């Protein structure tokens, strides 16, 4: 949405006699005007000399707004700008379709149904979905380092609510976020909607030759260590820290030393970012004597406490220690490459808007709704990574697709919005 500047000048003739203007400046006052334009186009049904029948709009020469007719999203009666507004509100501002139709749009004197909004969102998702293969190809290119996480969702099926999972993959270097919801086949050959099994991730990765995959310590990822031998698996130090923080907050003072040592490691990572170090320099710093001493201190504290009877510590402290011990190699594998991340926060941050949407909408009406959500959130979060407006990108994309363009690799947020 652009800011329209309207200049209001003072009428100097209204000054009292004898008054003198000492200086002049403009005071900015901001106002928002929300309204919907309803354009009525005269569409002609024409029979040509060769017998062809065609519907067409023939604009008048002085009709400055006639080009809006060419901005209609295929299969709808709204423009790309309108659809970008609706999808922005729903997926980025987490406004449910019901509240959009019954509150926001009705306040602007447009009475439309919730089903219309869902149908239009479906049409937009069909257009965006054409670009997913091109986006996936870049995200999973040879040697890529990716972060992966998942979150649960509910959807309506057969008069009851079912639980399923949406996955998120982030390639920080390529600045790409992809949400995916895949149908899989279980060990008995039965097809399942979504799910949290390793088959979902395996099928999405396919034969991609990525370099590393970072996740939390969920067993699905650990099984992949045996099946994807060429991919280095990293775990999340932030997860370990969270477990010690929880134990400390519940009274386990033994966790304090772990929190302090982990904080020092994070402090070093902040320094690398501030100094804008190269991956090679980060690799050297991560394997410096100072860093090694901190990690060895962590190891010593870990095994000293594990050597004591379990009764000497709380249950939460035991869970934190066991997590750190179990995933030690994967947690500190971030030292193997300067491009690796110390934690899995890139994927977790990308998932947060989905969790907000889940709280506001409670459940999806169908599997199709989940798939559309994955598509829209993919491009919303990728636009954030690239630093462009999703609304601007979506409008530009739909206009280019209407021209018949199929070079999808040149229509991605990082290419079309250069």
Model features per residue range: what roles?
Residues 45, 53-418:
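Catalytic center-proximal scaffold of phosphoryl-transfer enzymes
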Residues 1-74, 148, 282-287:
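Short, flexible loop/hinge motifs at secondary-structure junctions
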């Amino acid at each position: 949405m652009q800011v329209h500047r309207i200049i209001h000048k003072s009428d100097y003739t209204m000054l009292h006699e004898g008054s003198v203007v000492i200086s002049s400046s403009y005071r900015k006052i901001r106002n928002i005007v929300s309204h919907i334009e309803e354009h009525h186009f005269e569409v002609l049904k024409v029979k040509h000399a060769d017998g062809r029948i065609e519907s067409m709009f023939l604009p008048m020469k002085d009709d400055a707004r006639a080009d809006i007719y060419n901005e209609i999203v295929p299969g709808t009666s709204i423009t790309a700008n309108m659809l970008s507004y609706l999808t922005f509100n729903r997926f980025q501002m987490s406004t449910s379709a019901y509240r959009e139709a019954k509150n926001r749009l009705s306040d602007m004197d447009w009475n439309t149904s919730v089903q219309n909004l869902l149908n239009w969102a479906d049409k937009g998702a069909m257009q965006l979905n054409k670009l997913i293969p091109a986006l996936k190809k870049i995200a999973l290119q040879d040697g890529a380092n990716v972060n992966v996480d998942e979150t649960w969702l509910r959807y309506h099926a057969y008069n009851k609510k079912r639980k399923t999972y949406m996955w998120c993959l982030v390639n920080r270097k390529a600045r790409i976020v992809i949400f995916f919801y895949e149908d899989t086949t279980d060990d008995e050959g039965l097809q399942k909607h979504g799910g949290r099994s390793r088959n979902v991730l395996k099928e999405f990765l396919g034969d991609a030759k990525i370099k590393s995959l970072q996740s939390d310590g969920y067993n699905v990822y650990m099984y992949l260590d045996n099946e994807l031998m060429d991919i280095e698996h990293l775990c999340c130090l932030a997860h370990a820290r969270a477990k010690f923080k929880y134990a400390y907050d519940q009274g386990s003072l033994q966790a304090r030393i772990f929190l302090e040592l982990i904080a020092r490691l994070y402090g070093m990572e902040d320094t690398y970012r501030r100094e804008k170090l190269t991956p090679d320099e980060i690799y050297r710093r991560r394997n410096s004597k100072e860093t090694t001493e901190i990690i060895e201190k962590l190891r010593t504290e870990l095994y000293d406490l594990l050597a004591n009877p379990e009764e000497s510590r709380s249950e939460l402290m035991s869970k934190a220690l066991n997590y750190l011990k179990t995933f030690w190699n994967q947690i500190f594998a971030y030292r193997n490459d300067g491009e690796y991340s110390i934690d899995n926060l890139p994927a977790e941050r990308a998932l947060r808007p989905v969790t907000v949407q889940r709280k506001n909408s409670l459940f999806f009406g169908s599997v199709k709704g989940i798939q559309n959500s994955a598509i829209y959130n993919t491009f919303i979060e990728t636009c954030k990574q690239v630093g462009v407006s999703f609304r601007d990108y979506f409008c530009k994309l739909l206009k280019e697709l209407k021209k018949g363009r199929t070079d999808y690799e040149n229509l991605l947020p990082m290419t079309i919005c250069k």
